[in-house]
């Protein structure tokens, strides 16, 4: 049953009474996920069971996610007449798109990726390998979407309109350094915050039925006014919206990562506060995500760890010899040892029985965070970082340089989050 409530933005949201939206069962050698749509109809999607041993004691939801992450081949998608045209602005390698793709698979919707744009050439190449967008741009969105809000189309915008034609669902994760909690408050005035207005312009030009924008929680402290202006523009364009900060650790991701989301729609949106109510899971440790990779032998960059200096190798040895997870000040470099600091986790070792810390593009360095493997005397590999970021093995990262792997994986959004948001709204 669905009721209407007034959300924090004084807009109507749909409040759905508690129901089992995701249901899981075993059918032969397959794990089946059945989604109950608002119409009452059920849609099923499958993954192969990893192991038939001890299934009676397994949480089938957890096992489904585990099996999906370990799939080497992309799972089948049932062909239906329902389809959706998706554009991903600031796409990166495609974390948001992957989650929406999986939500479409779960709902029996055919996703078509109409447009993607990103400045990072390596990230966009990964996106293109996995989603084959009809049109993509390895350039700044501002170069092509360059008109003022409310103004007639520019020549460049008309070219984009002619190429892309129709967008039903816009995804956008504008560069967030200007809002990041890792930066001081003065950087919230960063010019990159104005990129939100380019998202507003794309919305104005294409009038999609749905919009999902992602950023760091610090965006709510925006000093430039662009965030407030963005929400006001959604209202003037006739969109309902709701917003939330989600903690990935509580939603099935083996990682402590908080992200801000705003979902907008031409019809009242389902209350985002119900994401935690309907889809929360028990905390999943990193062992859940990467235990099968401990014995993974490979000599390619994706499956090997970074090389470290002799001094950092010695620090890793010290952690294991003394069964420690934090490096004492006495073993740290002078910049930490000789003055007070709050970087307790830096040079640290991951806990095997806990979720990982936030994965960043520094995951290959001992000095960038708690990225030393729990069981092995090395930092985590790109493959392990991808798993922790909820990228399955069938996702094709291609052949990149180590720094490129770290950038595209560390800057991504765990796909589980956009999966849940899209599932909650599109069903």
UniProtKB/Swiss-Prot annotation:
Q: Name one GO molecular function term.
A: DNA binding
Q: Which SUPFAM superfamilies match?
A: S-adenosyl-L-methionine-dependent methyltransferases
The record's induction entry says: Constitutively expressed during exponential growth. Encoded in an operon with ydiP and in a second with groES, groEL, ydiM and ydiN. This second operon is heat-inducible.
Q: What is its EC number?
A: 2.1.1.37
Cross-referenced Pfam families: DNA_methylase
Activity regulation here? Somewhat inhibited by MgCl(2) and spermidine, strongly inhibited by MnCl(2).
What positions does the domain SAM-dependent MTase C5-type occupy? 84-427
Record-linked InterPro entries = C5-Methyltransferase, C5_MeTfrase, SAM-dependent_MTases_sf
- Tell me which positions the record assigns to the signal sequence: none
- Presence of the UniProt keyword Amino-acid biosynthesis in the record: no
Keyword rRNA-binding included in the entry's annotation:
no
Per the record, pH dependence is: Optimum pH is 8.0.
Per the record, what phenotype accompanies loss of this gene's function?
A: Essential for growth, it can be disrupted once one of the components of the corresponding BsuMI restriction endonuclease complex (AC O34303, O34885, O35025, YdjA, YdiS and YdiR respectively) has been disrupted. Triple deletions ydiO-ydiP-ydiR, ydiO-ydiP-ydiS and ydiO-ydiP-ydjA lead to loss of susceptibility to MspJI, which only digests C-methylated DNA.
Q: How does activity depend on temperature?
A: Rapidly loses activity at 37 degrees Celsius in the absence of DNA.
Q: Report the sequence similarity comment from the record.
A: Belongs to the class I-like SAM-binding methyltransferase superfamily. C5-methyltransferase family.
Read off the NCBIfam families from this record.
dcm
Assembly information from the UniProt record = Monomer. May form a complex with YdiP, also seems to be active alone.
Q: What is this protein called?
A: Type II methyltransferase M1.BsuMI
Q: Which organism is it from?
A: Bacillus subtilis (strain 168)
Lineage of producing organism: Bacteria, Bacillati, Bacillota, Bacilli, Bacillales
GN (gene name) = ydiO
């Amino acid at each position: 049953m669905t009721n209407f409530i007034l959300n924090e933005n004084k807009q109507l949201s749909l409040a759905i009474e508690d129901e089992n939206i995701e249901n899981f069962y075993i059918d032969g050698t397959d794990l089946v996920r059945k989604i109950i749509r608002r119409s009452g109809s059920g849609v099923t999607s499958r993954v192969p069971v990893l192991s038939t041993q001890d299934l009676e004691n397994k949480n089938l939801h957890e096992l489904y996610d585990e099996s999906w992450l370990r799939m080497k081949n992309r799972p089948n998608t049932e062909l239906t007449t329902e389809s959706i045209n998706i554009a991903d602005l600031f796409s990166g390698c495609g974390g948001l798109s992957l989650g929406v793709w999986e939500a479409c698979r779960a709902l029996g919707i055919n996703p078509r990726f109409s447009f993607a744009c990103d400045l990072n050439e390596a990230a966009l190449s990964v996106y293109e390998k996995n989603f084959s967008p009809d049109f993509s741009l390895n350039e700044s969105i501002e170069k092509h979407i360059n008109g003022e809000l409310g103004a007639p189309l520019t020549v460049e915008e008309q070219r984009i309109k002619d190429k892309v034609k129709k967008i039903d669902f816009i995804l956008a994760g504008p560069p967030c350094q200007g809002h990041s909690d890792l930066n001081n408050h003065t950087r919230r005035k960063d010019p990159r915050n104005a990129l939100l207005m380019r998202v507003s312009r794309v919305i104005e030009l294409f009038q999609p039925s749905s919009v999902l924008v992602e950023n760091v929680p610090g965006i709510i402290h925006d000093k430039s006014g662009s965030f407030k202006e963005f929400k006001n523009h959604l209202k003037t364009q006739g969109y309902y919206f709701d917003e939330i900060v989600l903690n990935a650790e509580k939603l099935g991701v083996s990682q402590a990562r908080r992200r801000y989301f705003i979902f907008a729609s031409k019809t009242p949106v389902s209350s985002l506060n119900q994401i935690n109510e309907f889809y929360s899971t028990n905390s999943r440790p990193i062992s859940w995500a990467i235990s099968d990779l401990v014995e993974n032998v490979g000599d390619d960059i994706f499956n090997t760890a970074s090389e470290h200096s002799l001094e950092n190798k010695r620090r890793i040895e010290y952690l294991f010899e003394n069964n420690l997870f934090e490096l004492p000040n006495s073993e740290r470099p002078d910049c930490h040892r000789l003055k007070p600091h709050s970087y307790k986790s830096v040079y640290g070792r991951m806990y095997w029985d806990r979720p990982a810390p936030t994965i960043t593009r520094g995951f290959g360095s001992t000095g960038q965070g708690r990225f030393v493997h729990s069981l092995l005397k090395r930092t985590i590999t790109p493959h392990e970082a991808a798993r922790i970021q909820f990228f399955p093995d069938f996702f094709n990262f291609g052949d990149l340089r180590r720094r490129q792997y770290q950038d595209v994986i560390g800057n991504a959004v765990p796909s589980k989050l956009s999966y849940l948001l899209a599932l909650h709204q599109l069903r």
